[in-house]
């Protein structure tokens, strides 16, 4: 997924303290608005607890206070990826080959911005998704948002 310059900088700043605590930084989202939000997704092989989120929040807050990359007031949220796991990198798509995903594109393809299908292949920065029996290829940089579709 094509990250903004701010999101790239935040990822660089945040990854070290998250990994130092023994967690994987799955990705981040910075949502601008009346009350902006910095959402950080973390994971580990043992799962994520509320205490883990609190520890990461505390460490990341300290680093962000020093680095100060965000010029507006914001809320910090730390959570596990959950069932509708967000996808941020080519590695995420590779890890979930064969799974169903929902994509929201930055720029429409075939007059559509929202797509849903099965992740078929990953080739560098290109993702192939089978939608209604037809393979569609998406540039990672054109994917605004992507989430796994949970099945129960």
Curated annotation (Swiss-Prot):
One Gene Ontology biological process: translation
Primary subcellular site in the record, as a coarse category: cytoplasm
Keywords, comma-separated and alphabetical: Cytoplasm, Ribosome biogenesis
Coiled coil: none
This protein's record includes keyword Cytoplasm: yes
CC per GO annotation: cytosol
Subcellular location per the Swiss-Prot or TrEMBL entry: Cytoplasm
HAMAP family: RimP
Family, as annotated: Belongs to the RimP family.
Summary of the function given for this chain in its UniProt record: Required for maturation of 30S ribosomal subunits.
Protein name: Ribosome maturation factor RimP
Organism: Yersinia enterocolitica serotype O:8 / biotype 1B (strain NCTC 13174 / 8081)
Lineage, top ranks: Bacteria, Pseudomonadati, Pseudomonadota, Gammaproteobacteria, Enterobacterales
């Amino acid at each position: 997924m094509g990250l903004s310059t701010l999101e790239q900088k935040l990822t660089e700043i945040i990854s070290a303290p998250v990994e130092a605590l023994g967690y994987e930084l799955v990705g981040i989202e910075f949502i601008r608005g009346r009350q902006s939000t910095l959402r950080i997704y973390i994971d580990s092989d043992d799962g994520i607890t509320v205490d883990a989120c609190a520890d990461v929040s505390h460490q990341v807050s300290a680093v962000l206070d020093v680095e100060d990359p965000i010029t507006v007031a914001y809320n910090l949220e730390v959570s596990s990826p959950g069932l509708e796991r967000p996808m941020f990198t080519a590695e995420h798509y590779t890890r979930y080959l064969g799974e169903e995903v929902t994509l929201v594109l930055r720029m429409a393809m075939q007059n559509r911005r929202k797509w849903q299908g099965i992740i078929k292949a990953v080739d560098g920065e290109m993702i192939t998704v089978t939608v209604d029996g037809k393979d569609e290829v998406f540039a990672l940089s054109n994917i605004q948002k992507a989430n796994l579709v949970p099945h129960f």
